[in-house]
Design a protein with these regions (language model features):
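A conserved pocket-lining segment of Rossmann-fold NAD(P)-dependent short-chain dehydrogenase/reductase
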Residues: 195-222, 227-231, 244
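NAD(P)H-binding glycine-rich loop region in Rossmannoid oxidoreductase-like domains
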Residues: 38-101, 113
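Glycine/proline-rich active-site loop of Rossmann-fold NAD(P)-dependent oxidoreductases
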Residues: 180-194, 231-251
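Conserved Rossmann-fold NAD(P)-dependent oxidoreductase catalytic core, especially the SDR/UDP-sugar
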Residues: 9, 94-158, 171
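Terminal hydrophobic/aromatic helix or amphipathic segment near a protein terminus
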Residues: 241-244, 251-310
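Amphipathic terminal alpha-helices
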Residues: 325-349
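N-terminal Rossmann NAD(P)H-binding glycine-rich loop of SDR-like oxidoreductase domains
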Residues: 3-29
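Conserved beta-loop-beta element that borders a ligand/cofactor-binding pocket
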Residues: 157-184, 194
Length: 349
């Protein structure tokens, strides 16, 4: 398999850094054919030390750098976009413009979004009378293509979906809560559950939203990264034998199951108490009013979700993707320890 020319953003981030690790673990001979965009020159030495053959491209997404980004993108067959990808339209536009400059040579754009896009801003934090809405990416893909315009990430998703053509293949990878220790060179920390854990530790008590029955999907970062590797391998399959679907049918939800926020609150609190980080295992219940939701903001929007969940079918069916890592609940002890250390708290073993 010839090494594809890949342009990757977000290599210093959590998901992008882990995906880069997975790509080069699976294909170490690809190192010299991958270019990573770095916005911070202070990371140069760590990347050059670990990956001496990796191509480093320093730029931002400011207007002043747009032409340079487009020109660099045009040199590559495949773009994996992680950095600020879900909510930053100018970077997506620069990538599409760059790939279009390749003309008939074509290009592939694998864009990272997030399942927050499934959250309807008009739906309040109440159990729906007509039951939970399940959105899947197979029979339900038309629903994913027509989500409300005011949904999170929606403006960027719409642009990516509309940019596909015969020569420019696009796909949106839409993971839910990502957990697990990252293997990237800079950031190894996720946001939602570590943020929730830190909030509990700093508050000195367990905190739960309402009845604890709100829920969301999750996926381990290693499982997610394996999907990106499979995507790239499929994209360069010889003689057009790839099985992935693209453009309007290139919408891939990523999840390995469901968790309930009340269970997570209790698990964090119990572990923190066991380690001497909290005075009791008691969990304080917060109401549904705006003030309570603001307190819980570090956990992200899904902590108030009763209404919708994702079902990832497309990656399983077409790419043979199967999540194999441990559950989110099993990762809680590691998360509590990591956040305690970051806060300078003494852990009792």
């Amino acid at each position: 398999m010839a090494a594809p020319k890949i342009f990757l953003t977000g290599a210093s981030g959590y998901v992008g850094g882990d995906a880069l690790h997975a790509l080069l673990a699976a294909h170490p001979d690809w190192e010299s054919s991958i270019t990573v965009l770095l916005r911070n020159r202070s990371y140069e030495s760590v990347f050059r030390t670990r990956y001496p053959s990796l191509n480093l491209f320093f730029a931002t997404y400011d207007v002043s750098d747009t032409s340079a980004v487009e020109a660099e993108v045009a040199k590559n067959e495949i773009v994996l976009h992680f950095a600020v990808s879900a909510d930053h339209l100018p970077s997506a536009q620069a990538i599409v413009n760059g790939l279009r400059k390749r003309g008939g040579a074509g290009g592939i754009y694998i864009h990272t979004s997030g399942t927050d896009v499934l959250l309807d801003p008009q739906v309040g934090p109440e159990p729906p009378e007509d039951g939970v809405r399940v959105l899947d990416d197979w029979e339900g893909i038309s629903e994913l293509r027509s989500l409300p315009d005011d949904a999170p990430h929606r403006d960027v998703d719409k642009f990516v979906l509309s940019s596909g053509s015969d020569t420019l293949k696009t796909a949106i990878v839409c993971p839910s809560t990502v957990y697990g220790p990252g293997r990237g060179l800079v950031s190894q920390r996720s946001a939602q559950i570590p943020g929730y854990t830190r909030l509990i530790l700093q508050s000195g008590r367990g905190l739960q939203f309402a009845d604890g029955k709100t829920f969301w999907n999750a996926v381990h970062v290693y499982d997610l990264s394996r999907l990106y590797v499979s995507f790239v391998e499929d994209a360069i399959a010889p003689d057009g034998r790839g099985k992935a679907t693209w453009n309007e049918d290139g919408y891939y939800l990523v999840e390995s199951g469901i968790y309930h926020w009340g269970d997570i609150a209790k698990r964090i609190t119990s572990e923190a108490f066991r380690l001497g980080l909290l005075p009791s295992e008691e969990v304080s219940v917060l109401g549904k009013e705006r003030e309570s939701r603001d307190i819980l903001r570090p956990a992200g929007r899904p902590i108030t979700n009763y209404a919708v969940r994702a079902e990832a079918i497309r990656a399983r069916r077409l790419l043979g993707w199967r999540p194999v890592e441990g559950t989110l609940e099993s990762e809680i002890p590691n998360i509590v320890r990591a956040e305690a250390r970051a806060l300078g708290l003494e852990v009792r073993e």
